[in-house]
């Protein structure tokens, strides 16, 4: 959970920006959007398989590109 302390002398706008950065860094909004709607287990599995395939393709391209040099 994002938690910041605000001093009396600190500008409120600056504190809000710092809070937003902290929330972004921790991935709270991203996680909330993922869990906003129910996702069937089969759909979840398909999405994970697709992400894994994409990751392996990217890794394969990286390896083949490095061999060219």
Curated annotation (Swiss-Prot):
Transmembrane segments: none
Family according to the record: Belongs to the bacterial ribosomal protein bS21 family.
Matching HAMAP family: Ribosomal_bS21
Record's keyword annotation contains Ribonucleoprotein: yes
Cystine crosslinks: none
Gene: rpsU
Name under which the protein is recorded: Small ribosomal subunit protein bS21
InterPro entries in the cross-refs: Ribosomal_bS21, Ribosomal_bS21_CS, Ribosomal_bS21_sf
GO molecular function, one term: structural constituent of ribosome
